[in-house]
Amino acid sequence: MRYNISLRGPAYGFQVVWHDSVFSMRVRRPPTIDATDPLKGLTIAVDPGHPPIGATGPTGLWEPIPTLAVGLKVRDMLAARGVNVVMTRTDSLPVDLNLRGTIARRANANALVSIHLNALPDGQNPYTNQGTTTFYFYPQAEPLARATHQALLTQLSLPDKGVIRRNLAVIRPTWMPSILCEGAFIMMPDQEAAMRTPEYQERYAKGIVDGLDAYFRALGQATH
């Protein structure tokens, strides 16, 4: 069965509920954007990727450690801009993938950004297949993915592996635009070494914040 629904304005997100044989759908409108600072007053969910599991670099750097460091820097940068930041984790304890999206939805977040570091399976050459990738799933998240991807390319100075639509658990939430960033390849020795440094972690974090700024600034202009 397929439903076609006509809307009076753009849909920012949606939520579908089926309860006692009753189907209902909530449609979310774009947030009101502050013209002087497009991030001020928003709620952003920051998801430092993993644990459990997670990739490990050549010298043993475990992905959840630098992703948390980057996530905490993103939190601090956003908080300084007047953003209400919701973290899916602030320590090394594992958090279920589906719970991460639930945390963002319960907080009524305006966006969800999941922070990761990439790796390749055995048999693939990382020297010819590495760089920065940004994933989204639902169409309403694509503009956020593209804005953040461009900002990450500027900050991290790595090859462009593109913006890709993929059905990943953490970016399936429909209530807000959700993206997953694979900023660098932890399996590359130089990138693993860079991700150990506060300076490069700061650059990763700044790329995310700059991407959010560009996205919400454009959204505010489009919906003004």
Protein language model features and the residues they cover:
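Active-site histidine-acidic residue metal-binding/catalytic motifs
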Residues: 27-103, 107-111, 121-124, 128-130, ...
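Solvent-exposed loop/turn segments at secondary-structure junctions
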Residues: 50-53, 90-95, 117-122, 139-142, ...
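Soluble non-cytosolic domains of exported or imported proteins
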Residues: 61-69, 94-98, 138-143, 195-206
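Flexible glycine-/small-residue-rich
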Residues: 7-9, 27-29, 48-50, 115-117, ...
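Sec-exported extracytoplasmic/periplasmic mature domains
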Residues: 72-83, 105-109, 140, 149-158, ...
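Active-site-adjacent mobile loop/cap segments within catalytic or ligand-binding domains
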Residues: 121, 133-135, 164-224
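Signal-peptide-cleaved, periplasmic/extracellular N-terminal interaction regions immediately downstream
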Residues: 1-43
